[in-house]
Structures are given as structure tokens and as C-alpha cells.
Amino acid sequence: MSEAPKRRLRSEHWFNDPAHADMTALYVERYMNYGMTREELQSGRPIIGIAQTGSDLTPCNRHHLELAQRVKAGIRDAGGIPMEFPVHPIAEQSRRPTAALDRNLAYLGLVEILHGYPLDGVVLTTGCDKTTPACLMAAATTDLPAIVLSGGPMLDGHHKGELIGSGTVLWHARNLMAAGEIDYEGFMDMTTAASPSVGHCNTMGTALSMNALAEALGMSLPGCASIPAPYRERGQMAYATGKRICELVLQDIRPSQIMTREAFENAIAVASALGASSNCPPHLIAIARHMGVELSLDDWQRIGEDVPLLVNCMPAGKYLGEGFHRAGGVPAVMHELQKAGRLHQDCATVSGKTIGEIVSSALTSNVDVIYPFENPLKHRAGFIVLSGNFFDSAIMKMSVVGEAFRKTYLSEPGAENSFEARAIVFEGPEDYHARIDDPALDIDERCILVIRGVGTVGYPGSAEVVNMAPPAALIKQGIDSLPCLGDGRQSGTSASPSILNMSPEAAVGGGLALLKTNDRLKVDLNTRTVNLLIDEAEMNRRRREWTPNIPPSQTPWQELYRQLVGQLSTGGCLEPATLHLRVIARSGEPRHSH
């Protein structure tokens, strides 16, 4: 019986196409000029891209520059040819005004590279917050065989004998400084001690959360998300990832076969169990939209709200990335969900095994870090989706609602899980910093801090500024948090139980633009509503008087972004881009360049 003819790889349309000999010669000779051979290029071996997100500008991902060597070794040993290329940098901690602008820009650039260059598959190097969604969005749009390689979290941080987490310690330290308990030098010493090595945040912030969800989706090898960056297993994972991408190419396994509706539902359940970042809903919705999968905030409410918190990691718990990894990481969390019947077990993964096969024997080694489903750290720990008479949707992360907040705001007899508060409204973070300590505002414990103009259009990009600290005077009295609300986001490392991502945002005429300081708001978690307590006539009067207040764009990309971007409720996508699905298969090969 004769073997089936070998499938012609995509790269061969560049490097070995006798029907277009002139173009083939042009493509081949330029890749030969740095030492590659015609034999290699025309061998029919898979050409594998390595999407390099590491650079001096992206410290959380910088070690990918070294890890890429292990990826290349794996690719070569599996018979492939590696080609490394840079991705537009995304550095959450240093990009101004916000790295959210870079998520969509890096996505666009990566789509063009994967579509327009002679690549048969790609290893997506991820780490810092928005590198993961940017890469997965591009993988979804192109549907080129792809696999995710996380760079992993940094080692656990310690300060004066205490475990401290990157990002999370910042919010604690700023309160200590406001209370006069530490000075600037003490603040800097404390916060920098949280980051002792290469890698992304060691807390369950956006970076670790999104890499965990990439694994839950099936787009990385089992255990990939949680291996700390300096561990030897991280290099071993890089090598295995390089080998596996070649197999995915030869078997023609594509993201559309992995990132199905059921896989996204699994990821939502995992996010709740992790106590994942509040940035996960818009990122996961964006990936799904580019994959052509219907996913909405209603799905987060329906699938994830009643899932318990299983992972005892900061900011919702007390441990960090090393403890999470040693306790079993993502597979151990999914094992608990599997036992509880909360997983689609037949979902395919890039490993070649189903989710059910991977997690069936993945027992945790530490039940103080990964709790059993039947005895969780907290019940009903997912995101709740809110609406009201001045907005359509917002989210609140229930895993970080602590006992102090619940006692103060959610425990009034006869009105449990609801409260009224006086609004203090700020026009962006500059206004907040300028006025938060103004005695004339008379801010007390029954106030809610409101910030607007920080959404996708207004900022632009949506800023992580909703988790606002109380005035220093209150902090000195022991009141270290107030309810917060806004049309922007907050850091995934924050333990603030804020009402976030309010859509539509103020800048596009959302009702948040109508709020005034001293208005009263009623927050009711039973009905999942936040209502402005003014009558309809007053609401209409304010709407007639409203005029847009959007600061000018500072760069060409900001201007273009504002014209094309949607709201956080639908993923903050560039809306025209969501119309282009699986472009490599559906649009045919790119036209020749000469």
C-alpha cells in the first residue's frame, strides 16, 4: 500500500515554486545571505516562527531571548527550521499612557507577519499581561498552527521575613506611606523586594492569570503556565514546545480546533477558581471574537459566578507563583473542576491529549494552596456582571471581597449584599491625585470613589486606575479601602473589590458622564444592579447638557485606535479586525511582492 502524498507546506509557496521561478529565486537568495542554504529552504521541512516578545523594553519577558535558544533546539531536533522575529513590545509597568494600546497594535503587527511571511507554524512567547491575549488574538485571526510558551512568574518576593507579591505589595505600601508609617525610601525598598528575579508578576495578576487561561484553553503544553522563570523546567518546557510545534504543523492542527466554544467555557471556570485578574473577561472575549466564537459577559455570569475560589494566591489569598507551581499549577486546579463536573473534558489541546486525559491524575500536592472543590477557600468567587439605570454592564471580582468590606458595606440587617453611598467623582487619575485629600470633599466611609474618562476611547486604551486609595486622613484612621467605580480597569494584582469596565464609557456618552459629586448610588449585589438615585427628568436634563470631554490624541496610533476600538464589554477590540477570521485559509496565499 503506497503512502499518501506528503502535504505541501505553506512555506514551499515561497521557497520552492517552479511556476514562479523568479519569485522563488528572490525569496531563497535573500534568506541565504545570512548563512542558510538552498537545501534547507527547499527541503520541505516546516519553517517555524518564534514570535519574540522579549526585549530590553519588556523586562518581564526578557528571558525569552535565552529561552528561544531552547525552542530552536527543539524545532531543529523535530526536523523544523526556526525563524525568530520581534513582536511590538508590551510592558505593563512602564508603557504610558497604558499598555492596552499595545495589545491591539502588537496583535495587528503579528497578524501581518504570520500572514505575509513564509511560516508554517509559530511559537508564541508570552509573559507580561497583554502579550498573551495579543498573541492568542493573532493566532485566532490567522489560524496558523500555533503554541504558547509562557516565560513564567518570577520567584517569590520577601521583605523582612514576610512573603510579598509583585504589584499587590504596591497597594499595601502606598497606604503605609500615606499613613506615615514608612517614608519614600522605605516604600521603594518594600516594593522592589517583591521582584527578585526574571519573570512576570509572581501574584495571580493578569500575567499569571492569562498564561493559566492559555493553558486551560489547550494552547500550551500541560504545566507550562506556572513554572517559575528561573527554574530549569522552564528551559525544558521551551525545548518540548519547539518540538511539539513541528508535530502540530505536520498534523495540520490549528487554533480553531483547540479554541472552541467549550474550551472558552473551561477557561471561564478556571478563571473563577484561580481568583484570576479582572482583566481576564475583556481579554478572553477578545480572543474568542477573533476566533469567531460567540462569548459575552453573560457567559462569565452564567458559567463562572458560582465557581468557588480554589487557589490561595495573592491578591485573593496568601501564596505566590512558586507555591502555586509546586502545588500542581493549572492541571491540579482543573482536576478539581473535573471532579465537580465543571469541565468539558473532550476539548483538544496542543499536546495531543484531551483536557480530561491531562487533568484526570493531576492531584494537588498542597491543599493549603489549591483547595478541594468541596471545601474551597471561598464560595461563589467568580465575576458578577452588573447593570443599572446609567450603564449597560460592568464587572466586580468577588474573590477579593474580604470580610472587612463585607462587614462594612454588605451586612446591614434586612439589606444584606447592598449599600448606598455618596459619589465622589474624578475626571481621570490626574484629578484624583490632585483632589483626593481635599477636605472640602468631606470623604468618609460611606462614600464611593468614581473615576471616568479612563475607558478605551477616553484615556485612550483604558487605564488601570479604578482601584483608588482613600484620603490619607481615612487611612490614618484605619480605613484602607473604599468602594470604587469607573469606566476603566484596575491592576490584576489589586485586591480592591471595585466595579470596573463600565460600558458604555463616559467618553462616548455613557451615563457615567452624567454623575456628579454628592449624587447617591445604590449598589445591590442581589439584583446585580448599580443605580443612580435621581429621577428620570433630572437624568434627561443632564443628558441634554452633556458635551464630550476627550483629551486630544498624542500620537497617530492613539487617533486611529480611538476611531476603531470598541468597549471593554466586548473585548476592547479593533472592531473592523473582528470581521477577518482564519485569514490564512480563507483569503488564500498573499500576492507576490514583485
Predicted regions mapped to residue ranges:
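Catalytic or ion-coupling anion/metal-binding cores of large enzyme and transporter domains
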Residues: 2-56, 60-62, 67-87, 93, ...
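Short coil/turn segments at secondary-structure boundaries
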Residues: 58-62, 94-102, 122, 127
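N-terminal small/polar loop signature for handling phosphorylated ligands or for N-terminal nucleophile
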Residues: 84-117
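Well-ordered alpha-helical segments embedded in enzymatic catalytic cores
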Residues: 105-112, 134, 266, 431, ...
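Amphipathic coiled-coil/heptad-repeat helices and related helical stalk/stem segments
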Residues: 106, 132, 467-470
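A short, small-residue-rich loop immediately preceding and capping a beta-strand
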Residues: 114-135, 146-151
